[in-house]
Amino acid sequence: MRKFIYSAALFAVAVFTSCSSSDDEYNKYADRSYGISAMSACSELSTALNVAYSEINNANLTEAQKTELQNILDKIADDVIVETYKQLGDAAVEMQDALGTLKSDEISQENIDNACAAFKKARKLWENSEAFLGGAASDFDIDPHIDSWPLNRDLLHQYLASGKSDYTDEQMEDATILGFHALEFILFRNGQNRKVAEFQGYDTYKGFTDIKGETELAYAEAVIADLVNHVFELQVSWQENPDANRLKAVQDAGLDYLVAKTSKSYGYNLKHAGNSSESTFGTLEAAIQQILSRTEGSCRGISDEVGTKKIANPFANGDVSYVESPYSYNSITDFANNIRSIENVWYGGMNGSSSNATYSFHKFFAENSSAVGKRVENAIADAIAKIEAMPYPFVNYCSTIWNVKFEDAELVEYPEEE
């Protein structure tokens, strides 16, 4: 009896705690201040980056300062951009190897789990590259090709319902059902790796219960192969001495990889800023603007996008369908890694503020305009902190705010940006 009373007491406490915890969770989801703070932090970071560029652009730079700034660009090209894309290529290959050409009767949970782990590794590296989308990623439309969202589930269902086991190049052209987000849908549900049983039978997602897992595996194989080619394209586009095997894959796929004006690499292009016969950047300042503060494809560009689109569209504007990475629950991680891409560029290495690079914007501003530099660095740290403080998962946060289930949210068409 005593034991029963003790257990009952524990049960009562557990129920009370569970209810209290559930209430607290709901209250947090209903609290708009978290999203507002994250958007405000991104706005401050964008402003700080613009101020930093203006400080350089308006300065009467000495020759020593110009040399240091060029060294910073060289460091960013080699140690941030090329290295990020190389590691991204490695992770994409890992994902491809995990799934391979396995059929539904051959695949194991280990295959799925390994593919999911490689997906998250690749996803982190891709999000860590979004501060430097200016260049190959935008010139060759690689960014929209491998990272368009929301996923067009209706169109994807049409493809999968056709029962195809292979896909032509022409059929792999609609970016709304390709890249990371198509793979995310196939590999993850409700923030969890999918169970192998689904791939051996039928999907369980609303509207997809007539789709066989083996059909999804065949489609995933085609999408991964396409993704691998395009991340290789990013890598060899920036390398002055490209990896021979990856270059061959890019050439075999008929993909572009050189700057049109000079037929040189994008790394070479950045390193020769100011030499109009060797670079698309007529001045050193123009190259720095592209890295730090252009409205698109720069550090400021991705800070703006995170605050005014990735967070604002679903959270502030009510377009719940616009949540990025909703199936893996990776949204907040994606947003924070976007800001970390800015951090890597600013500090000149893959480890953010711990990079200790020989040349970096961090060191340049510490020596020449410390208040401006500190403003950027504080804004980076604050943006990451405010983003990571938002209720997890972001898709549930937005769904609660607007009382709309993600799977029921209708796609909203946005005008294409010029």
Q: Could you tell me what each predicted segment is?
A:
Residues 1-2, 31:
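Short, intrinsically disordered low-complexity segments
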Residues 25-418:
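Mature extracytoplasmic or organellar-lumen-exposed domains after removal of signal/transit peptides
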